[in-house]
UniProtKB/Swiss-Prot annotation:
GO biological process: cell differentiation; fibroblast proliferation; maternal placenta development; positive regulation of mRNA splicing, via spliceosome; spermatogenesis
Descriptive protein name: DAZ-associated protein 1
SMART domains xref list: RRM (SM00360)
InterPro entries attached to this UniProt entry: DAZAP1_RRM1, DAZAP1_RRM2, Nucleotide-bd_a/b_plait_sf, RBD_domain_sf, RRM_dom
Record's compositionally biased regions (Basic and acidic residues): 91-111, 185-194
Keywords noted in UniProt: Acetylation, Cytoplasm, Developmental protein, Differentiation, Methylation, Nucleus, Repeat, RNA-binding, Spermatogenesis
Alphabetical list of Pfam families matching this protein: RRM_1 (PF00076)
The record's account of how the chain is modified after translation: Acetylation at Lys-150 is predominantly observed in the nuclear fraction, and may regulate nucleocytoplasmic transport.
Stretches with biased composition (Polar residues): 195-207
Modified residues (N-acetylmethionine): 1
Subcellular location field: Cytoplasm; Nucleus
Length: 407
């Protein structure tokens, strides 16, 4: 609808509509007083729910007086309040409370005939309020404030009387008993009646405000990605930059990569490792001890590495150990008695999926080993010479040839 001054002629403002009232029912009701050329119900833009009021325009402006003379009006079980829409410039000063409520200081001739009613019971409607306050004078308007989201009264409203004497009689009692509940009643003062201190924020500034850059610089820093890490005290460190001397962060979710695969050099170890056999140096069957590098540590200098095998690099983060293939030799003659040293090199262990240097330890001197369970005796003890190993627990490799008559 156009809100120009000429378009206001013949138009009615209808307040107090029920939430279920539609434009069709509103038009049908007022059609009994004359031809309705336009009808609209104001709705909330967000929820598309009725706001409780609307406008009706008649083709004949005289129909407005007929509607006002036929009060009260009831639609969909609710009392409605139709009022003429007078152009703003044609309203008399007394009937323009909006300007007195919004602008300028309060004066004697800007007093409003409106009272504020607070603490209204939830089961009290506009009809009950009108019936109660009409004993103080002629009630011209009843406005209850509703919650736009919950679509229910907020517990307060405004009553407008025809004269100021009725307002004085109503506010003589500060508290009124309405439907068994104590209700506060006081004169409704214009919005700017009280002096406002300089610099004090207005009513429109008390709403929710969005503070720009609320993070104060925190939001300007991008979060670390998977290829980045966190330095000391939670500082962000770009990808590839050293973090506290630990080198560049590994790829992935921050977890170090698994040790390089030792194909055909590492034996499958059950949970907890093999128990060390008696008679062998301590730590022989212990699980490998890895350092912060990416490969196993080199063997101690006092232990024997397999012949022909280069020592592993001692630099942390070096490439995986690479052993040369074992020399091809014929199998030992099982009919010959064992000698002091095996007649095949230690590189033969590669065929059994083992390499003791990968565990960080090797064999001790065969002549200094104590006897073990089921193992051959050392030279000088009356038994055949040892081959550097026995047949105790946890051993799944063969150091020397097997003889069927030696146990």
């Amino acid at each position: 609808m156009n809100n120009s001054g000429a378009d206001e002629i013949g138009k009615l403002f209808v307040g107090g509509l029920d939430w279920s009232t539609t434009q069709e029912t509103l038009r049908s009701y007022f059609s009994q007083y004359g031809e309705v050329v336009d009808c609209v119900i104001m709705k909330d833009k967000t929820t598309n729910q009725s706001r409780g009021f609307g406008f009706v325009k008649f083709k004949d402006p005289n129909c407005v007086g007929t509607v006002l003379a036929s009060r009260p009006h009831t639609l969909d079980g609710r009392n409605i309040d139709p009022k003429p829409c007078t152009p703003r410039g044609m309203q008399p000063e007394r009937t323009r409370p909006k300007e007195g409520w919004q602008k300028g200081p309060r004066s004697d001739n800007s007093k409003s005939n409106k009272i504020f009613v607070g603490g209204i019971p939830h089961n009290c409607g506009e009809t009950e309020l009108r019936e109660y306050f009409k004993k103080f004078g002629v009630v011209t308007e009843v406005v209850m404030i509703y919650d736009a989201e919950k679509q229910r009264p907020r517990g307060f409203g405004f009553i407008t009387f025809e004269d100021e004497q009725s307002v004085d009689q109503a506010v003589n009692m500060h508290f009124h008993d309405i439907m068994g509940k104590k209700v506060e009643v006081k004169r409704a003062e214009p919005r700017d009646s009280k002096s406002q201190a300089p610099g004090q924020p207005g009513a429109s500034q008390w709403g929710s405000r969005v503070v720009p850059n609320a993070a104060n610089g925190w939001a300007g820093q991008p979060p670390p990605t998977w290829q980045q890490g966190y330095g000391p005290q939670g500082m962000w460190v770009p990808a590839g930059q050293a973090i506290g001397g630990y080198g560049p962060p590994p790829a992935g979710r921050g977890a170090p990569p698994p040790p390089p695969p030792f194909t055909s050099y590492i034996v499958s170890t059950p949970p907890g490792g093999f128990p060390p056999p008696q008679g062998f140096p301590q730590g022989y069957g212990a699980p490998p001890q890895f350092s912060f590098g990416y490969g196993p540590p080199p063997p101690p200098p006092d232990q024997f590495a397999p012949p022909g095998v280069p020592p592993p690099p001692a630099t942390p983060g070096a490439a995986p150990l690479a052993f040369p293939p074992p020399p091809s030799q014929a199998a030992p003659d099982m009919s010959k008695p064992p000698t002091a040293q095996p007649d095949f090199p230690y590189g033969q262990y590669a065929g059994y999926g083992q390499d003791l240097s990968g565990f960080g330890q090797g064999f001790s001197d065969p002549s200094q080993q104590p006897p073990s369970y089921g193992g051959p005796s050392v030279p000088g003890s009356g038994g055949p010479p040892a081959g550097g190993s026995g047949f105790g627990r946890g051993q799944n490799h063969n150091v020397q040839g097997f003889h069927p008559y030696r146990r």
